[in-house]
Amino acid sequence: MSRARGFAFALGSVALVSGAQLGMRWSMTRLPAPDQWLPALSAGSVDLAALAVVAAAIAAYALSMLCWLLALRDLPLGRAYSLLSISYALVYLLAASLPLFNEPFTLSKTLGVALVILGVITINSRSAPATSPRNTP
């Protein structure tokens, strides 16, 4: 098991799922409700770029899942799972700082994100045992 490789795959999963969330948000502000996509496509009134971003976001979710599965080969679940919380912070910070999302910074959300990051650091700062009786064949 390689802890560094596990962290790299877990953080890759976080980056992909965060990008997918932002892409979905951007797209859904430019598209009709999903049940109206087919009628809108027939009428030629769908933003094809937004639809392409939805497709790319779905692909990013699939790649994120692959990275997650690879991360789980190298990291204990309790440690790896905490890393997923970084996506909440990342999505909030990017959505609030990029003007195209028009999301506000708020004190309560920012404090919540700080607590999440502090929790991730706390969980991952202790060194984990290399193996445990449950992990050995």
Curated annotation (Swiss-Prot):
Keyword Cell membrane (UniProt): yes
Topology in membrane: Multi-pass membrane protein
GO annotations of cellular component type: plasma membrane
Subcellular location: Cell inner membrane
Principal location: membrane
Transmembrane segments annotated in the record for this chain: 6-26, 50-70, 81-101, 103-123
Origin: domain of life: Bacteria
KW Transmembrane (keyword) present: yes
Pathway: Bacterial outer membrane biogenesis; lipopolysaccharide biosynthesis
Residue intervals on the Cytoplasmic side: 1-5, 71-80, 124-137
SUPFAM superfamilies cross-referenced by the UniProt entry: Multidrug resistance efflux transporter EmrE
Periplasmic membrane side: 27-49, 102
Biological processes, Gene Ontology terms: lipid A biosynthetic process; lipopolysaccharide biosynthetic process
Single GO term (MF): carbohydrate derivative transmembrane transporter activity
Keywords carried by this UniProt record: Cell inner membrane, Cell membrane, Lipid A biosynthesis, Lipid biosynthesis, Lipid metabolism, Lipopolysaccharide biosynthesis, Membrane, Transmembrane, Transmembrane helix, Transport
Function: Translocates 4-amino-4-deoxy-L-arabinose-phosphoundecaprenol (alpha-L-Ara4N-phosphoundecaprenol) from the cytoplasmic to the periplasmic side of the inner membrane.
Complexes and interactors: Heterodimer of ArnE and ArnF.
Protein name: Probable 4-amino-4-deoxy-L-arabinose-phosphoundecaprenol flippase subunit ArnF
Gene name of this polypeptide: arnF
